[in-house]
């Protein structure tokens, strides 16, 4: 965590407040069939100059954590979160693809594709 001076208290960390909508936007694109996880990450990395995209970050965090967040949002009535949770469970959690901790999530470890110089070359 990064220590900062807060102007006002709020529940949760500042990083999580920023991170959750970012990864949910990426997940929404994938669940709706717009793009795949690697394409979403590649787009973010090329356009934003980041070292990782939302799916690489999810792998590093571990996929159980976003499932818990999505499940809580779904239970609070968020229909999109319910679809995202269902997809994450079906495609990854139930297949024991939990991210870096199991050696596979959206990427395979120890050498994930997003670390390759070729990964950020635009595809045609």
Residue ranges and their predicted role:
Residues 27:
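Catalytic, metal-anchored helix/loop core of enzyme active sites in primary metabolism
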């Amino acid at each position: 965590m990064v220590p900062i001076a807060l102007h006002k208290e709020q529940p949760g960390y500042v990083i999580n407040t920023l991170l959750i909508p970012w990864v949910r936007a990426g997940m929404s694109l994938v669940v709706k069939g717009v793009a795949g996880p690697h394409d979403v990450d590649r787009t973010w990395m090329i356009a934003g100059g980041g070292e990782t995209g939302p799916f690489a970050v999810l792998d590093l965090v571990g996929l159980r954590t976003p499932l818990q967040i999505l499940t809580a949002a779904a239970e609070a009535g968020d229909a999109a979160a319910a679809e995202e949770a269902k997809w994450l469970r079906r495609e990854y959690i139930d297949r024991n693809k939990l991210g870096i901790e199991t050696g596979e999530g959206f990427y395979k470890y120890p050498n994930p594709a997003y670390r390759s110089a070729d990964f950020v070359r635009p595809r045609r």
